[in-house]
Every structure is written in structure tokens, then in C-alpha cells.
Amino acid sequence: MNEPATFAVVTGGGTSGHVLPALAIAEGLVAAGHDRSAIHYVGTRRGVETRLAPAAGYPYTLLDVVGLQRSLSRRNLAFLPKLVRATRAARTLMRGLRPSVVINVGGYGSFPATWAARRLGVPYVVVSYDCRPGLVSKLMARRAAACAVAFEGSALPRAELTGAPVRQRIVALDRDRERPEARRELELPRDRFVVAVVCGSQGAVAVNRAVTDMVERFADRTDLAVYHVVGERNVGDAAPGRDGTSGILYRVIGYEDRMPQLYAAADLLVTRGGAGTIAELASVGAPAIVVPWPGAAENHQVDNAKVLSEQGAALLIEQHDLDGERLGAEIDALMFDRGRLAVIAHRAYEAGAIHRSGALIELIERVARQGSAR
């Protein structure tokens, strides 16, 4: 495939909710025939991309930029100077790379490279996979060549329904076929009902408390295993694990990057309502209890979760309704009604068809071709 040295710059970062979709787009471009060396990732020096970007194997640049805090914070004093310097650095980078297209996946880390693309006349695509677009997505959408959205009814200009970016390994996942090997890899028993709790790279304190309480209530259950990803910053406060010898098996992990294996191994997941998580659950057909983060801008995680829950493709519990008793009751109900669990999984998989369609990569390539033809 004939293309300039850099075909695409993919930008966005800070949290796994932006970094993983960015890397998913990079994977999709490679699967479409573009050379790995022709895809350049741009993120921040402070987010999870400091670990994920080097491991992914793409050329990358990490800029010194921080997000604007909603509350009064000394970090806000550094926001504007760092943003100006990062944008200048991004402009220099873009002049050297001369990409055919820039893909913005949102978050404060995506602003410098996208603004530089706009100033240099490089066509860019805004990828918005939340029901309610974030601030950077809304700002950048005004001059975008196209906006790729995951849900119907987007207010963004030139919006096209493409589904959300999902990693190739997850798109191809067969949960039933891969479950035995996934459980071996994660050291989970084959004969227990496995609940995986994973609430993003930072974890979730309120969910962690509810899970800890639920584990205490179910301490003598020999038919249940809980694989709890508490978040690295919460490991020190986490309850001790239980080996399952005479009751529940409870595994506590700070961070887990083997999400395909976790989706395959789990009978049921407990998650937050980030758009990337919702798209992955649907793509693989994994039944889940979704507890939206109440601190999300405009409470958009509730809207994301409703995309599945209103189709009977997930259970939605808002955080103010969550405790160990409620969580345990919902898990018990699904554990002993496998027919209902299977229906939820099937409806989730049906909802994920748009994310498995490949339409997002097709849109990006079309924008790149149109830009080159100018």
C-alpha cells in the first residue's frame, strides 16, 4: 500500500478509557493493511499510556500536558502554559510526520495534536464513543472532516454511526470456546461461577466496598469465585484475598491488562459505564452489572449503560443504590437463573454488531483518501 511515511496520527490519553480505544484504532489500521510504523500515537506523559504505548509497538510521542480540574486546584495554574507548549511541540511533530489523517479519540491529551492538525490543514476525524461527547470532542468537531459516533442521535456535525473502537483481539473473542484456557491462564477454577469486577485503570472505591461486603456475606460459598481488579492505588486498602479452600475464592489484583482472557473466563462482570467498556461488553456478548461512575461529566456513564440495560443486555445499578447486599442479591439471582444470564449475553452480543462492523476504519481511510486528493 503506497502511503507517506506516516499514514495516521492517533491521539488521546490520560486514562485507559482513551488510550485503549486509540490503540484499538491503530490495531484496526494495521489489520486493514497499513504498516505499523506508519501509525503514530500521541498521548500524555502522565497517563497509563506511559506503560501501554511502549508495549504496543507503534511510534509514539508523549506530551507534557495536564487536564483542567473542575475543582479549585493548584494543578490548574500549570494547565494553560503546559497546553501552549504541548501544542507548539505537536505542531513541530506534525510538520515532520506529514500524516494523511489525524484521529482524535478525546480527552485532554488529544487537544494539542488535533489543534496542530487543524492549523496545518491536515484532515482529522473525531471519534466520540460516549452518548454525550466530551468537551474536547465538541470543540474539535466543528472543523473535523467527519465525526465517528457509537450511538444514534449524535448532535456532533458530520456524524456517522461507526461503532466504538474495540481491540481486534476482543472483536475476535469466542467466550465459550476460550473459557477453559482463559481460566487456566488466570488460575481460576473450572467448576465455580466466576464474577470479574473491573472498574477501569483507577478502580472504584465505592464498588470495591460493596464487593468486599458481598464477599463477607458469601464467605462460605464454595460455588463462587470473585476476581477483583481494585485499581493500583487501592491495593493497600483492599481486603485480603481468600484461597477458596473452605469457602469463596476471592482474588485481589491491582491492575489487569489481560481483558480478553477476563471476558472469556467470567460468567458475569461488574464494571463502570465508560463507553469503551460498554462497547467491549457488547462486542463479546458478556453479561454485566454496570455501576456508572457518578462523577462523569453530565453523568454520561448512566446514558452509556442505558444503551445496554434498556435492551435487556445488561443490569444497571446506580452507585447510590449499591451495597454488598444488593450486589450479592443480583449476582445470586443470575447465578441460579442461567437462562436469564444467557439472554442478557445474547442481547449484548446483538447490540455489539455495530462495533464489530469495521465501519470506523473505513471512515478513517475515506477521509485520508479525500485529503490526499485535494
Question: Language-model segments: which ranges?
Answer:
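Conserved nucleotide-sugar phosphate-binding/catalytic loop shared by glycosyltransferases and other
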Residues: 5-13, 36-82, 320
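A short, well-ordered alpha-helix in the C-terminal region of glycosyltransferases
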Residues: 340-354
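Conserved donor-binding/catalytic loop of nucleotide-activated donor transferases
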Residues: 120, 264-266, 282-291, 311
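C-terminal alpha-helical cap of glycosyltransferases
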Residues: 353-374
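Active-site-proximal region of nucleotide-activated glycan assembly enzymes
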Residues: 40, 59, 118-180, 185
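Donor-nucleotide binding loops and adjacent catalytic segments primarily
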Residues: 52, 178-184, 188-269, 302-306, ...
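Acidic donor-binding loop of glycosyltransferase active sites
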Residues: 99-101, 256, 264-278, 286-287
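Glycosyltransferases and closely related glycan-assembly transferases
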Residues: 89-102, 110-125, 138-143
